[in-house]
Amino acid sequence: MGTLEKKLDNLVNTILLKAENQHELLFGACQSDVKLTNTQEHILMLLSQQRLTNTDLAKALNISQAAVTKAIKSLVKQDMLAGTKDTVDARVTYFELTELAKPIASEHTHHHDETLNVYNRLLQKFSAKELEIVDKFVTVFAEELEG
């Protein structure tokens, strides 16, 4: 195995370790004293942007509805979410952030923005020609991951 392959292997493994048991890799340290899972924080962020149901959240996060239900129950218990029934179909519940949850959702959004800023700073170090190669590599790598 060549040096570049080893570097790539180390990078992928480092990313996996940093994102272990999370559904994303974010830059920036958490400022909140509230202990939530990454999934719970992501749910708060998504709900701060639009009204969603359990099913909508599961699709957006690419996780099971059971996992969303578990996360939501915990957030409701911690007074971070309030459920409201749909006026047309009472079987459908929408969740809204409480005042307690809004700063946490905002911070999670900030971490997403900061992560994109880090990527942008990294990409600015490359020429247009090099960026074409990076883009091609990322595309091919993603295709390999999908199998």
From Swiss-Prot:
A single GO molecular function term of this UniProt record: zinc ion binding
DNA-binding residues (ranges): 54-77
InterPro entries with a match to the protein in the record: AdcR-like (IPR047894), ArsR-like_HTH (IPR011991), HTH_MarR-typ (IPR000835), Metal_resp_HTH_trans_reg (IPR052067), WH-like_DNA-bd_sf (IPR036388), WH_DNA-bd_sf (IPR036390)
HTH marR-type domain mapped to chain residues: 1-143
Binding site for Zn(2+) 2: C30, E41, E107
Keywords: DNA-binding, Metal-binding, Transcription, Transcription regulation, Zinc
Binding locations of Zn(2+) 1: E24, H42, H108, H112
Organism: Streptococcus pyogenes serotype M6 (strain ATCC BAA-946 / MGAS10394)
Record text on activity regulation: Zinc acts as a coregulator and is required for DNA-binding activity.
Gene3D superfamilies assigned: 6.10.140.1680, 6.10.250.2360, Winged helix-like DNA-binding domain superfamily/Winged helix DNA-binding domain
Pfam family, any one: MarR
Free-text function comment from the UniProt entry: Zinc-responsive regulator.
Protein name per Swiss-Prot or TrEMBL: Transcriptional regulator AdcR
Gene that encodes the chain: adcR
Top-level taxon: Bacteria
Quaternary structure note: Homodimer.
Coiled coil: none
Intrachain S-S bonds: none
